[in-house]
């Protein structure tokens, strides 16, 4: 039997795609290994969001080729960098056999066979009219992912933010039918999932078909919540423009829906938001936050921020700081703006100096870290439900789980009783990125 190794970069959608690729390829006679040195087929499933993504791919490809150049191996470049770079990958890394975009991964079996027969380069970066989900059998979905599972419900993006390549690498927005999603959710729960994370590039833009109707995300969540042994539901990533009434109500009425929303704002300046083509204002964003908090007082938020977008002044940046101070995030992710070839932001002449971007990022991160630590410290002395997987902690007998607010929670579990269970935990200590607790015996 041949062996398959997949390295995944980037977002949860890529993790889900890697799981799909495993399930697609295993019937060809492959077993999955965790060591690239033992693999006959190597797939790098890439992400194009962050700076120098293409260079990181070429560097990794070079390392693999150098270490395996005397052994027969098939190398596949997959994901969003593969979509963006296309044939250029073969020019810069001629030892790569296959290039496949994220919407074409279902064609991998044919591409692998074709590459083995021709001993030449094979590429598929099409956006097929038949979506990738429609090409797959039920056997490719819902296989065991442990106690917490990913389920893709929506792909692509129609927003065209001026800093982002996703519309060009993932294509137009597409929503899977309700029944297809529900079948996969049932199968995931039957295979041990207690929590399902609903995924989409703009997950709250979901508009799936159900018996001649169009359902939004809130209605879908209420439907999935009926699955008896499913205990938790999450969704990511949402866009402020796509918030809708039934999603507000789902947070108020569905106990299984976790009280935590990742809602990227990117900037606290209306001028910069217009330049980014985000199509909402800071005032509208804050109205969304307040509406959720009124309906669900214990709800918490995380967000994404880009500092140093072209044209950002000190006043614009201060707007971001004021917004963070007002919202008080449980978590947040912040990055310096980096140009993406082919996006409108890359063409602008008013780029912010790198030194200024670095200074602003450090200022913002200091505030975000302070808020995150304070939120974590507010948990000390409380008892919270924690979902544990098989993730081990730094110390012997220690296991790590997730709180409803996505905090990492460590406890001692010498008898391995808590794995794949939701356990009530008393929080004893808190740090920047984790909590320490002890299991409360029933």
Curated annotation (Swiss-Prot):
SUPFAM superfamilies: Radical SAM enzymes. It comes from the Bacteria. Residues 2-117 form the MTTase N-terminal domain. Keywords: 4Fe-4S, Cytoplasm, Iron, Iron-sulfur, Metal-binding, S-adenosyl-L-methionine, Transferase, tRNA processing. Its EC number is 2.8.4.3. GO terms for molecular function: 4 iron, 4 sulfur cluster binding; metal ion binding; N6-isopentenyladenosine methylthiotransferase activity. The keyword Cytoplasm applies. GO terms for cellular component: cytosol. It is found in: Cytoplasm. Monomer. Catalyzes the methylthiolation of N6-(dimethylallyl)adenosine (i(6)A), leading to the formation of 2-methylthio-N6-(dimethylallyl)adenosine (ms(2)i(6)A) at position 37 in tRNAs that read codons beginning with uridine. This is tRNA-2-methylthio-N(6)-dimethylallyladenosine synthase. It comes from Wolbachia sp. subsp. Brugia malayi (strain TRS).
């Amino acid at each position: 039997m041949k062996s398959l190794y997949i390295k995944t970069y980037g977002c949860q959608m890529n993790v889900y795609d890697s799981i799909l690729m495993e399930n697609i390829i295993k019937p060809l006679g492959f077993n999955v290994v965790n060591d690239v040195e033992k693999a006959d087929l190597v797939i790098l499933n890439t992400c194009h969001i962050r700076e120098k993504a293409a260079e990181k791919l070429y560097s990794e490809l070079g390392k693999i080729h150098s270490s395996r150049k005397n052994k027969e191996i098939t190398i596949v470049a997959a994901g969003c960098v593969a979509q963006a770079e296309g044939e250029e990958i073969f020019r810069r890394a001629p030892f790569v056999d296959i290039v496949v975009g994220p919407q074409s991964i279902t064609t991998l079996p044919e591409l692998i066979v074709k590459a083995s027969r021709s001993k030449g380069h094979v590429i598929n970066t099409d956006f097929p009219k038949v979506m990738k989900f429609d090409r797959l059998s039920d056997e490719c979905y819902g296989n065991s992912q442990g106690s917490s599972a990913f389920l893709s419900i929506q792909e692509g993006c129609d927003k065209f933010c001026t800093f982002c390549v996703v519309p060009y690498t993932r294509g137009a927005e597409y929503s899977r039918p309700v029944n297809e999603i529900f079948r996969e959710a049932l199968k995931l729960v039957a295979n041990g999932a207690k929590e399902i994370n609903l995924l989409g590039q703009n997950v709250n833009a979901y508009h799936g078909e159900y018996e001649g109707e169009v359902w939004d995300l809130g209605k879908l969540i209420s439907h999935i919540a009926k699955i008896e042994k499913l205990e938790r539901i999450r969704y990511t990533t949402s866009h402020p423009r796509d918030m809708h009434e039934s999603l507000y109500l789902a947070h108020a009425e569905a106990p299984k829906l976790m009280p935590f929303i990742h809602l990227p704002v990117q900037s606290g300046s209306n001028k910069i938001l217009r330049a980014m083509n985000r199509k909402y204002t800071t005032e509208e964003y804050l109205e969304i936050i307040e509406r959720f908090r009124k309906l669900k007082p214990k709800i918490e938020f995380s967000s994404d921020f880009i500092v140093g977008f072209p044209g950002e002044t000190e006043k614009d940046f201060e707007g971001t700081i004021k917004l963070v101070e007002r919202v008080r995030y449980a978590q947040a992710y912040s990055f310096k703006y980096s140009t993406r070839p082919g996006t409108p932001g890359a063409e602008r002449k008013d780029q912010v100096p790198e030194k200024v971007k670095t200074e602003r990022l450090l200022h913002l991160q200091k505030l975000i870290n302070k808020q995150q630590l304070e939120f974590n410290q507010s948990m000390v002395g409380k008892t919270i439900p924690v979902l544990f997987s098989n993730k081990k902690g730094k110390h012997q007998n220690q296991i790590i789980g997730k709180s409803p607010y996505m905090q990492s929670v460590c406890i001692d579990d010498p008898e391995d009783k808590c794995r794949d269970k939701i356990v009530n935990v008393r929080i004893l200590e808190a740090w920047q990125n984790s909590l320490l607790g002890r299991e409360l015996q029933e």
